[in-house]
Amino acid sequence: NRQQEIFVEILKDKDKEIFMNDRYQSPLSERYASKEMQYIFSPDKKFKTWRKLWIALAETEKELGLDITQEQIDELKAHAEDINYDVAKEREKLVRHDVMSHVYAYGVHNIKAKGIIHLGATSCYVGDNTDIIIMTEALKLVRVKLLNVINELSKFAMKYKDLPTLGFTHFQPAQPTTVGKRASLWLMDLVYDLEDLDHVIANMRLLGSKGTTGTQASFLELFEGNHETIKKIDGMIAKKMGFDKCQPVSGQTYSRKVDSRVINVLSQIAQSAHKFSNDIRLLQHLKEVEEPFEKN
């Protein structure tokens, strides 16, 4: 049909940009995601974080004695925000590697510093560390919103703590309770979730710069086998990126148990939200609790 033809024409027209780089786009994000969360998972956030990581690495290597000048560092910082997507996109068609394409694109802006970009690192240095940073920021945003729900629900529970209502077991009439007491059950689940969320956030650690197999072999070569110097790399990078520590041991990638922890705590929050909303839906059927509907 005509709509499909128009879409194909747009895709063919290289002068038309159909994606926005300052937000994450999916069929669900426009309806359900906040602008803050969309930005956290956006291309802009991702690639600007890559560049921050490259700057942190270069600064660390300079401070530990490699032949890197402050002029080179300043040049990297001057172009940290202006992501040249067009250059990276064209380069990726040639090399078929996203990280190397962006190393090249960053180097186009940094004539004097292009030789020190990504020095000694692997793709996972930017890829995995950025994933950790993005997940941590996203979890902190979830925490803010979870605290808001807990606060509002606690007010609701206190307001209706003495309002009697029928309690149920197996959704069969049982004994009297109060509306506030019922709300406190939803509230308690969310408090459990907050405790678990705080634990996950507190234990988020950067990967660091571990090299191809987690042995930092490339840095052993760069620093001529100086183990004491190499031991300082991860801690210095972590501090520059706002973290207390890096994972003490890993391969090239961070342990995917980290992803499992994140998914698990998000699942727990979703389970609590489901219990909360499902109870309201059932009570709405009984005309005991109703959600508001606006005129339009």
Language model features by range: what are they?
Residues 1, 13-15:
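Intrinsic-disorder-associated, low-complexity terminal segments enriched in Asp/Asn/His/Tyr and depleted
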Residues 4:
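Cationic, low-complexity basic patches in intrinsically disordered or flexible, solvent-exposed regions
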Residues 18-217, 228-238:
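A helix-coil-helix interface module used to build multimeric assemblies
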Residues 63-67, 112, 159-162, 203, ...:
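Intrinsically disordered or highly flexible coil/loop and linker segments, enriched in small
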Residues 193, 244, 252-296:
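Glycine-rich anion/phosphate-binding loop at the beta-strand->alpha-helix junction
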Residues 236-252:
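A short, charged helix-loop
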